[in-house]
């Protein structure tokens, strides 16, 4: 049974089931199918020969049995992801539950499925999984949790329910379909695309109506994500999913890789118009589809409107800024100028005093030290600053960058600015530890902590001079850009932890975030800061700070780990700094004492 024959059967069964759907002859059938009369005549003749139609375009018993055996069995809806591109509205609700015309997207999909008699619906959830629970009562759907949703792509979501794939629709949760894309009858496997050309699409529609896949294609038809997989092809797909998931290199793959790449599945193209199926992947796409959606009323959007005296329609080009260990930031444009909205991440209210941060920004205002600030809320930490176009972070492998950063840091320290709060490293070490819900994962933590805190005596003997210190003076927070005069300048950003402290702490912080593995690298940076004139006492003191700050951020990482956030090599290296530089500092202190 080829695609054309099945299309005719499906059209004629609809005529029998819907009195208002009238087809009296082949010409009317051709109009419904948007085919030529000659093609319809050819297909009808073949169906009659095969015993599926009589002379009056009426389905035979054989045809009805065939169609009854061609009913879809179930549906898998993929709804586990974060929806990162939906900033800022992805922070309170999964995008599957965003409302268009007062109905959540996923509810519209479920009801469209019910319209064609499909009630066996499985939803793969992950981010904010609890928000989907009500659907089990309202629609009798099944929820399956993908525990790896935060670190793997939707190939793994489909793998969680691969045993269910057989005569199955696979549907992404973020689509709004103006007309029902599902049917009571399906026979062959297909994947839905539209007529628009997408430069990043690896599939294109061939003359035979199939999809041709090639990663090397420069462009192809825009992929929607909806597919139907029949029982025969499902066997191949499930095997391919298993093969791909066995290799960690495929963690970021989409499920379509299993469908198209290195398989014998012939996938038909179901081509729709681009305005029939709309993907809602951003705040702006939702606004374009439903400008009255209640989801558009967002706290950060309201702040932007107030600060810049604009409406939400004036806010354009919104996209997430992934960098940042504690914050969820996004970039936006108002009146042709770009800005960054910083929204503090979960749990940061325990770690950062936003009133103190606001005090710091007021203190450094006018010194051309940091990015231009337009708004900061001392209560919730929401912040708007100018986005530096064509900027870049410090390259820790570039000696010129390192020298420039150390000069910027030294010039800032030489201002001797003061605020009314300090950053007490010893208190912070204990504070982060107090947030733990379990013992340290490091077996020798207690001894390591005792050793590192013992360095305080030497630091105090140096009588460090306190001034406003950045604390988080890491390479990523030094932004290089070209100013209006064509000269390169550096802005030091992200002052959340800043307070009164020995300014030499900033040197240690830069080193440990750079993950320097060799002592010579740290010595080189110290020499850049001091122009080669660092005293032995100051050098040892910085070694002490490397150990202390390593323990500090190791404790911070342990707290975040217990919340389910991992930082990989960074967290392991911080603990190593605590242990290794305690030894180095202790040895150098002994040498210094012998010289006295």
Residue ranges: model-predicted function:
Residues 13, 55-75, 222-306:
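Conserved alpha/beta core of the MobA/IspD/sugar-nucleotide pyrophosphorylase nucleotidyltransferase superfamily
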Residues 9-28, 32-34, 65-129:
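N-terminal glycine-rich phosphate-binding loop and ensuing alpha1 helix
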Residues 7-9, 20, 178-253:
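Conserved core of the sugar-phosphate nucleotidyltransferase
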Residues 504-534, 547-565, 579:
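Active-site activation/catalytic loop segments of kinase-like enzymes and analogous catalytic loops
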Residues 319-426, 439-447:
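ATP-binding pocket architecture of kinase catalytic cores
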């Amino acid at each position: 049974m080829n695609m054309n024959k099945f299309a005719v059967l499906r059209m004629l069964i609809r005529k029998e089931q819907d009195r208002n759907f009238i087809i009296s002859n082949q010409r009317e059938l051709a109009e419904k199918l948007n085919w030529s009369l000659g093609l319809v005549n050819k297909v009808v003749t073949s169906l009659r020969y095969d015993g599926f139609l009589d002379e009056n375009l009426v389905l035979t018993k054989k045809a009805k049995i065939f169609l009854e055996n061609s009913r879809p069995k179930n549906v898998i809806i993929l709804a586990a992801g974060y929806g990162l591109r939906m900033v800022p509205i992805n922070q309170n609700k999964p995008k599957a539950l965003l409302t268009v015309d007062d109905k959540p997207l996923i509810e519209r999909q479920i009801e469209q499925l019910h319209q064609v008699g499909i009630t066996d619906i499985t939803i793969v959830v992950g981010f904010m999984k609890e928000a989907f629970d009500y659907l089990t009562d309202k629609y009798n759907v099944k929820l399956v949790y993908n525990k790896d949703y935060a670190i793997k792509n939707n190939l793994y979501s489909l793998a969680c329910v691969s045993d269910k794939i057989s005569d199955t629709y696979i549907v992404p949760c973020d689509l709004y379909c103006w007309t029902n894309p599902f049917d009571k009858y399906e026979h062959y496997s297909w994947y839905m695309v539209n007529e628009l050309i997408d430069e990043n699409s690896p599939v294109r529609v061939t003359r035979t109506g199939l999809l041709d896949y090639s990663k090397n294609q420069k462009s192809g038809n825009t992929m929607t994500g909806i597919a139907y997989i029949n029982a025969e092809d499902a066997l191949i797909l499930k095997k391919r999913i298993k093969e791909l998931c066995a290799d960690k290199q495929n963690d970021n793959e989409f499920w379509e890789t299993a469908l198209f790449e290195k398989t014998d599945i012939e996938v038909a193209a179901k081509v729709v118009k681009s305005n029939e199926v709309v993907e809602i992947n951003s705040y702006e796409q939702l606004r374009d589809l439903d400008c009255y959606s209640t989801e558009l009323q967002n706290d950060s959007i309201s702040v932007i409107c107030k600060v810049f005296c604009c409406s939400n329609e004036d806010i354009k080009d919104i996209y997430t800024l992934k960098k940042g260990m504690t914050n969820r930031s996004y970039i936006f444009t108002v009146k042709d100028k770009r800005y960054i909205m910083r929204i503090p991440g979960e749990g940061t209210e325990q770690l950062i005093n936003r009133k103190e941060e606001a005090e710091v920004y007021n203190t450094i205002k006018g010194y051309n030290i940091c990015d231009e600030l337009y708004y900061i809320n001392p209560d919730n930490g929401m912040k708007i600053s100018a986005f530096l176009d064509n900027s870049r972070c410090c390259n820790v492998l570039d000696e010129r960058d390192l020298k420039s950063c150390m000069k910027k840091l030294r010039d800032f320290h030489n201002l001797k600015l003061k605020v009314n709060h300090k950053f007490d490293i010893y208190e912070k070490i204990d504070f982060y530890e107090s947030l733990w819900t379990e013992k340290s994962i490091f077996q020798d933590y207690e001894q390591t902590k005792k050793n590192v805190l013992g360095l305080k005596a030497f630091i105090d003997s140096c009588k460090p001079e306190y001034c406003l210190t950045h604390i988080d003076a890491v390479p990523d927070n030094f932004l290089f850009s070209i100013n209006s005069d064509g000269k390169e300048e550096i802005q030091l950003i992200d002052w959340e932890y800043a307070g009164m402290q020995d300014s030499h702490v900033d040197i240690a912080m830069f080193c440990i975030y750079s993950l320097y593995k060799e002592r010579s690298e740290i010595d080189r940076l110290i020499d850049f800061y001091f122009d080669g004139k660092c005293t032995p006492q100051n050098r040892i003191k910085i070694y002490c700070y490397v150990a202390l700050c390593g323990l500090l951020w190791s404790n911070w990482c342990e707290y975040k780990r217990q919340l389910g956030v991992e930082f990989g090599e960074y967290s392991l290296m911080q603990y190593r700094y605590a242990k290794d530089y305690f030894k180095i500092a202790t040895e150098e202190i002994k040498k210094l004492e012998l010289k006295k």
